[in-house]
Amino acid sequence: MELKKNYKFWFATGSQDLYGDECLSHVAKHAQIIVQNFNESGILPFEVVWKPTLIDSTSIRRTFEEANADEECAGVITWMHTFSPAKSWIAGLQAFKKPLLHLHTQFNEEIPYDTIDMDFMNENQSAHGDREFGHIVTLPHLCICGM
């Protein structure tokens, strides 16, 4: 891959609409913060571009097909914020032809043990969603796990 070209990495966040619009707005905000931090860090050779949260197999497949067609897209970084059913990703992953990096981490650096409730638990299930997603990924990929 020619590094002189102005490539971009897409950041695709998985979730589902089971927990409602408020939860999905938190998911989008968290993903945008991660993208901003990637871009401000200077550790990646190209810009990371936030994509809207993917909540169903149709939007997932469409996003991967658009990534395939976009000559500036060097690859996609995936992250499962809330529990994103892995079966929703199968058709998109089968269609995808570019590098994939699976970011397997929670958004929060620390768990708020004193105030944790079911809303927090439901909204922050990335560990479960990422494990299931990692299991079904059949393309050569890299999985980065955080603490």
Descriptions of predicted regions:
Residues 1-147:
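Metallocofactor- and cofactor-centric catalytic cores in central/energy metabolism, strongly enriched
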